[in-house]
């Protein structure tokens, strides 16, 4: 084995005290195996049985916390009615002694399936855009508070289902749209006035989840967050060569990361970043992912997950 890969096989201790035997992770992948009510099926169970010994952490594909958050017809939904089916998933994921993580999200503005079935797709603002192909309904403050509670209830269900942790998906969908300069046009405490107000929903959801975890989960329960470091919107009326309109910048994300690191989280997951437009904004074209993740690592090194 090449020496540079040796560290991947070494144990690592998370901030919550849990030691993982290696540093391999199965990243979240949506396999579209759920039934039409969001319940896992044997397709999901068998998928995880085949991969149960591949990594120390196994993370499910995106799992909705609301019927109004479904982005596809066979997406996982962590609802009361699906709890027993999720217990089969965790049993399969943990069958070789590794840790099972559920990635939780709300589809928000991208919840096309919810729009088709229930008549509404929700976002921070009503927006005249050619990206979606269907109208957005602006969330009221009361609805936002309900969504925060739904994340908390889904956290309870994740604990009861036997998951060892949760990854909060802040990289796209509802939370991303509130953090976005493009999608968020609100003028209230959840609005676009400042980075603090654009970050408010992410932090409120995280705080609700932490409250439940502290009250109900084992001390070594894992809590991670997934970010999209930087993003630009390219609509049909834009040329990709112009770089698109800013959704959020790396500096924006670093601000939100630091706010989240004031809370008891165990890791930060940086996904592939931006779209075609993001690459046009680089001062130096090259190994883009290494440049961006390297910057993020400098900000978090020793504070969350000592990679």
Residue ranges of model-derived segments:
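Flavin-dependent oxidoreductase catalytic cores
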Residues: 1-307
């Amino acid at each position: 084995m090449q020496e540079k890969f040796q560290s991947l096989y070494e144990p690592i201790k998370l901030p919550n005290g849990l030691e993982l035997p290696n540093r391999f992770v199965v990243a979240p992948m949506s396999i579209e195996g759920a039934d039409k009510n969001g319940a896992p099926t044997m397709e999901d169970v068998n998928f995880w049985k085949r991969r149960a010994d591949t990594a120390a952490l196994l993370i499910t594909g995106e799992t909705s916390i609301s019927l109004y958050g479904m982005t596809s017809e066979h997406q996982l939904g962590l609802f009361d009615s699906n709890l027993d089916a999720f217990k089969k998933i965790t049993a399969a994921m943990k069958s070789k002694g590794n840790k099972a993580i559920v990635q939780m999200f709300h589809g928000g503005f991208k919840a096309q399936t919810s729009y088709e079935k229930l008549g509404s797709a929700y976002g921070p603002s009503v927006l005249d855009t050619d990206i979606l192909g269907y109208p957005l309904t602006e969330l009221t403050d009361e609805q936002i508070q309900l969504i925060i509670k739904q994340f908390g209830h889904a956290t309870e269900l994740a604990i009861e289902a036997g998951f060892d942790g949760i990854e909060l998906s802040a990289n796209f969908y509802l939370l991303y749209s509130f953090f976005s300069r493009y999608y968020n046009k609100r003028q209230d405490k959840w609005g676009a006035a400042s980075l603090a107000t654009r970050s408010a929903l992410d932090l409120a959801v995280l705080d609700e989840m932490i409250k439940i975890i502290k009250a109900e989960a084992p001390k070594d329960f894992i809590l991670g967050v997934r970010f999209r470091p930087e993003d630009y919107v390219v609509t049909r009326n834009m040329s990709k060569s112009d770089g698109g309109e800013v959704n959020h910048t790396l500096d924006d994300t670093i601000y939100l990361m630091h706010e989240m690191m004031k809370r008891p989280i165990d890791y930060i997951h940086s996904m592939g970043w931006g779209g075609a437009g993001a690459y046009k904004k680089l001062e130096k074209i090259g190994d883009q992912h290494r440049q961006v993740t390297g910057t993020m690592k400098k900000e978090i090194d020793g504070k969350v997950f000592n990679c």
